[in-house]
Amino acid sequence: MTPWQQAAADDAALMNDFQAICSFGGRLSGTGQDKAAMDWALTRLREIGPDVRLLSVPYDGWRCLSNGVTLLGETPLHLDCVPLLRSASTDPTGLEGTIIDLGAGRPADFERAGDAVRGKVVLVRHEYPFAPDHVHRRRKYDMALAQGAIAFLIANPVPNAGPLSGS
C-alpha cells in the first residue's frame, strides 16, 4: 500500500464519507442514485462549511438509448446491465459471442489468457479502489480491447447490488 493509500485508510472520517457515497450505488445521472448522493454530499459539506452551493453546468454528454445482455442457451437469461460511459454501439441485431471469465481482470489474468481473449466477450469482476492491487475498470477494458476482445462485461460481486456504471 502506498503512503497516501495508507493515510486514506487510516483516516476514519474520510473512510466513513467514502463508504457513505459508495452506498448510493452507481450514481449514473437520472437513476435517482445521483440525486440521493448529491443530497447527502450537500448535507455533509454544509457540516464542514457554510458556503455550499449546487451549480448546474451545461456539458456535452453521452446517452445510452438501449442496452441488453442475454445469456443464450436452452432457457435464455436476460441480465440487468448498464453500459460503460462512451461504450461503442453494436449493429441493430446486436452481438453474439463466447464469454471468457478473467476473474479480477488483473494484468496477470490477461497475460495468462493470451490469445484466448481474441474474438471473445471478456468478463471481469468489479472491484472498489483503495486496495494495493486495484485495477480500474477502464484499464481492464483497455487490456481486453488490446487483446482482441469483441465485448467487455463487468460483474458486480455484491449480490443484489444492481448493475455498475462508470467509464
How would you describe each model-predicted region?
Residues 1-4:
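Short, contiguous pre-domain boundary segments
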Residues 7, 11, 19-121, 127-128:
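Noncatalytic luminal/extracellular "stalk/propeptide" segments of secretory-pathway proteins
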Residues 14-16, 165-167:
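Short, compositionally biased low-complexity segments
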Residues 60-70, 153-156, 160-166:
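BRCT (BRCA1 C-terminal) domain core and associated BRCT-interaction motifs
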Residues 107-164:
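A conserved hydrophobic secondary-structure block that centers on an alpha-helix together
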